[in-house]
Amino acid sequence: MNPVYSPGSSGVPYANAKGIGYPAGFPMGYAAAAPAYSPNMYAGPNPAFQQELEHPAHVSSGVQMFMFGHAFSVARNGAIPSGYTPGTPYKVSCSPTSGTVPPYSSSPNPYQTAVYPVRSAYPQQNPYAQQGAYYTQPFYAAPPHVIHHTTVVQPNGMPATMYPAPIQSPRGNGVAMGMVAGTTMAMSAGTLLTSHYPSPVAPQVTMPTYRPPGTPTYSYVPPQW
């Protein structure tokens, strides 16, 4: 055995060589015996968990015996304690707080429809897109015979054709051109007063030259079949 470490026997106090003071209630020695085994989850006497499971004979149907299996049959025989007081049913209520059965709903979803989004056949706006930045035309899914090799249908969100929102032209505030609001004529530069304001000019649209129908410029190649 290791001479430095030798485990003490039960009931022998610890060797307090340095004289360290311990708080009241501190175990100054090994326990004389291990604590008694308790089948409860928490230590300490709890009369509600010490009772045996008691049920009339007509309660134990085949379905219940199938659900609980061996543990249920052993509990009925009194071999193991259960957490149920005598005279109370073993099943938990549907609503432990009120004890009432929740209302019937034809939907298998246990959540309310108004709280959660619902997938619909109509177009949905992307909630993360800027709502005022673009005008979107109504977007509907085409029938399958149109989609086939023809149209790419996007998922719910912003459609492919987006129109930029028009930018409002600045309003004139009655100030002379080139002047800053809140200043006088003497404070403004003469060049700014005399310089003309650039008027918007429409971009020149180039139209392709029209070629009258006639003999094409390329030579006619007869079919090869």
Swiss-Prot record:
Entries under InterPro entries matching the protein: FAM168A/MANI (IPR029247)
Keywords assigned by UniProt, alphabetized: Cell membrane, Cell projection, Cytoplasm, Membrane, Transmembrane, Transmembrane helix
A Pfam family annotated for this UniProt entry: TCRP1
Subcellular location: Cytoplasm, Perinuclear region; Cell membrane; Cell projection, Axon
Gene Ontology cellular-component annotations: axon; perinuclear region of cytoplasm; plasma membrane
TM regions (residue ranges): 59-75, 174-193
Membrane topology (Extracellular): 76-173
Keyword Hydrolase listed: no
UniProt membrane topology term: Multi-pass membrane protein
Superkingdom classification of source: Eukaryota
Stretches assigned to the Cytoplasmic side: 1-58, 194-225
Function field: Inhibitor of neuronal axonal outgrowth.
Family assignment from sequence similarity: Belongs to the FAM168 family.
PANTHER family, per database record: MYELIN-ASSOCIATED NEURITE-OUTGROWTH INHIBITOR-RELATED
Protein's UniProt name: Myelin-associated neurite-outgrowth inhibitor
Organism annotation: Xenopus laevis (African clawed frog)
Gene transcribed to yield this protein: fam168b
